[in-house]
Amino acid sequence: MIPRLPTTCEGVDKLLAGGIEQGTVSLVYGEAGTGKTSMALQLSREAIKSYPDHVVLFVDTEGLSLERMAQIFGDCDTSKFLMIRPSSLSDLHQTLTSKLEQHDKISLIVVDTINAYVRLSYMKNKGISSRQFLEMTSILQPLAEKGDYPVLITAQVYEKDGEIGPYFGKSLMHLSKTIIHLEKRKTPGLRHIRLKKHRSLPEESVEDFVLTGNGIE
């Protein structure tokens, strides 16, 4: 059985048969406020607890709230949480590559969100931004396989004809072995997590979780 890193959220871990698979890329997408960053932070916390001599590389393109991080991390050792805040798509690629060369003990890589800078640069030069995006994403799966750690990427979404999907969806769906869609419900804080793609678990399976001040439960 493939090793998994649990989120400690019952609904999420139940849907994923124990957590996020190691050695693969998992994609989480959903509208703003569905819990993508909270899930990424909670998984980061658990990675630090499970592998205290390893580091978590967290690429932040959204302006992560340090207050939110403190809420979810609690007394967890943040010295093992290495945040990368690139200024552009090309900087993201270069900085991530540099960090990977500096650290050989990694428990998790997170990119939150992977398509933020691409949307901006795509408006200016579609050809260059698409090529840079493909170059960046193409290094993630080999890294996950070689390092035997999970890579979690979150994605911004668009809506067309009533359907919600991630920007640059075709590239991301080809890259990702697991694809998860987070959905808001009418009850405040209640979310659905829907499994859109998995190599061994039933697709379109759904579980519930609650987005709280302390993370996802």
Regions found by a protein language model. Give the residues of each.
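Short, surface-exposed amphipathic charged segments that create phosphate/polyanion-binding patches used
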Residues: 94-102, 192-199
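Phosphate-binding/switch region of NTP-binding enzymes
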Residues: 143-217
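A conditional alpha-helix N-cap/helix-loop micro-motif detector
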Residues: 5-9, 37, 89, 133
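Switch/connector loops and helix/strand junctions flanking conserved nucleotide-binding motifs
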Residues: 66-68, 92-93, 117-120, 161-163, ...
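Conserved P-loop
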Residues: 20-98
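Pre-Walker A adenine-sensing motif
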Residues: 7-20
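P-loop NTPase motor core
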Residues: 86, 96-174
